């Protein structure tokens, strides 16, 4: 009877926990697949957007932009 309890514990508890862990990984896989299917132009725009900063003239700069001109 003890062996039957151990087998039931393994299948009902541990197997359930293992499948729940796999479910948690699916959103990341979907996000990676969505990025892979995106056109190269859109991917480039996403990658360059954080690096883009507003340029301003040095005499008008208030710290909210870079003096890159």
From Swiss-Prot:
<feature type="disulfide bond">
    <location>
        <begin position="55"/>
        <end position="69"/>
    </location>
</feature>
<keyword id="KW-0528">Neurotoxin</keyword>
<dbReference type="InterPro" id="IPR004214">
    <property type="entry name" value="Conotoxin"/>
</dbReference>
<keyword id="KW-0964">Secreted</keyword>
<comment type="similarity">
    <text>Belongs to the conotoxin M superfamily.</text>
</comment>
<dbReference type="GO" id="GO:0005576">
    <property type="term" value="C:extracellular region"/>
</dbReference>
<keyword id="KW-0732">Signal</keyword>
<keyword id="KW-1015">Disulfide bond</keyword>
<dbReference type="GO" id="GO:0008200">
    <property type="term" value="F:ion channel inhibitor activity"/>
</dbReference>
<protein>
    <recommendedName>
        <fullName>Conotoxin VnMLKM-04</fullName>
    </recommendedName>
</protein>
<feature type="disulfide bond">
    <location>
        <begin position="61"/>
        <end position="68"/>
    </location>
</feature>
<feature type="signal peptide">
    <location>
        <begin position="1"/>
        <end position="24"/>
    </location>
</feature>
<dbReference type="GO" id="GO:0090729">
    <property type="term" value="F:toxin activity"/>
</dbReference>
<dbReference type="Pfam" id="PF02950">
    <property type="entry name" value="Conotoxin"/>
</dbReference>
<feature type="disulfide bond">
    <location>
        <begin position="56"/>
        <end position="65"/>
    </location>
</feature>
<keyword id="KW-0800">Toxin</keyword>
<feature type="propeptide">
    <location>
        <begin position="25"/>
        <end position="51"/>
    </location>
</feature>
């Amino acid at each position: 009877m003890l062996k039957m309890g151990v087998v039931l514990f393994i299948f009902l508890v541990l197997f359930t926990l293992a499948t729940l862990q796999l479910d948690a990984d699916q959103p990341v896989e979907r996000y990676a697949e969505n990025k892979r299917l995106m056109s190269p132009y859109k991917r480039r725009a996403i990658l360059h957007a954080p690096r883009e900063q507003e340029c301003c003239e040095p005499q008008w700069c208030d710290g909210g932009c870079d003096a890159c001109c």
